[in-house]
A protein has these predicted regions:
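Acidic/histidine-rich alpha-helical segments that form the ligand environment
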Residues: 1-2, 51-102
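Conserved alpha-helical segments that form or flank metal/cofactor-binding pockets of metalloenzymes
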Residues: 7-44, 106-117
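Generic signature of intrinsically disordered, low-complexity segments enriched in small/polar residues
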Residues: 15, 99-102, 122
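Carboxylate-rich helix-loop segments that flank metal/cofactor sites and access channels
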Residues: 30-67, 71, 126-133
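Short, hydrophobic secondary-structure boundary micro-motifs
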Residues: 40-41, 95, 122-123
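Glycine-rich, aromatic-bearing surface loops/beta-hairpins
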Residues: 108-109, 118-132
């Protein structure tokens, strides 16, 4: 978040953290507490910094941030699918199904934003010549 210069990407990340990630964390904390599982220690939150405070050579650019978040969302989709497939408790499986849906929606939103900003470069089209057939 501290490295983001694009306002649309910053809004997306804030919404992703506030609406999706924090709600997932709270739901999982509640599930663990109900089942008597001790919560692991969490690191302290990082302070908010201005992008101007970060030296230009140390900044992560918006394209890299969007790609990393997209990769994280894709990994989250796979993880949620694995939990749903292996889960014996229906309530936990449904919970991860909800997480899966939120991650899929966030992925589509990020893809649209990335296309709009020109951050997604489509690969060259493969044209088959009649000589190659």
């Amino acid at each position: 978040m501290n490295h983001t210069g694009d306002e649309d990407l910053k809004k997306f990340l804030e919404g992703l953290i506030e609406n999706d990630m924090n709600s997932e964390i709270e739901e999982l904390k509640a599930l663990l507490k109900v089942n008597g599982v001790a919560l692991p220690p969490a690191p302290p939150e990082r302070p908010v910094a201005s992008i101007e405070d970060i030296p230009p050579g140390a900044r992560i650019n918006d394209v890299e941030i969007a790609a990393a978040v997209s990769t994280g969302l894709a990994a989250g989709l796979v993880t949620c699918s694995q939990v749903m497939g292996k889960c014996l408790r229906e309530d936990v499986g449904m919970l991860f199904g909800q997480f899966h849906m939120k991650k899929a929606q966030a992925g589509v939103t990020l893809l649209r934003l990335s296309k709009k900003k020109g951050w997604v470069v489509p690969p060259p089209l493969h044209v088959r010549n009649s000589d190659q057939a």
